[in-house]
Amino acid sequence: ETGVETAFVETVPEGTADFGNYVRDFIEQGFNVIIGTSFGYMDDMEALAEEFPDVVFDHISGYKANGTNFGNSFGRMYEPRYLSGMVAGSATSSNLIGYVAAFPIPEVIRGINAFTLGVLETNPDAQVEVVWTSTWFDPVVEGDSAQALLDKGADVIAMHQDSTAAGEKAEAAGARSVAYNSDMSAHA
């Protein structure tokens, strides 16, 4: 036992008062460290950190910080991205790899850069083309973006999205895919 008391709540929608209400509840219960694990909580956490200067706020995957009680952290997801890029570079026949990506934020860009470096490590002739969807979860937009890349000749589709749509489009076209954030084992 560590002597540290923890509590959590799941499935809190982004962009609603719910997140702030849960945080205030935790603070009233005496919690002095708050960790938010969704990119969409970033602005709310920034405001809450200002409101509660004696509470430490850590935002997973964000890029904002105030230097006192609000910071961010994220795992080294670029490392497996690099490795998956090596596999994609070895797997492509067309030398065009498509990448369906949500938003041009540091987390996503780090992943794309690492993936591309991995591709080039095993196939210096390959190119990675990125399509931005401007959404974390919209299966129609993600699928259409993957299809556009497939139509250009991509035979491997990678993604940084929250649905399986891009991978499903790749599978339907007989292409390979590199998943992220969604269980794609049914399509392997």
Question: Where are each of the predicted segments found?
Answer:
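A residue-level marker of the well-folded mature domains of exported/periplasmic proteins
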Residues: 1-188
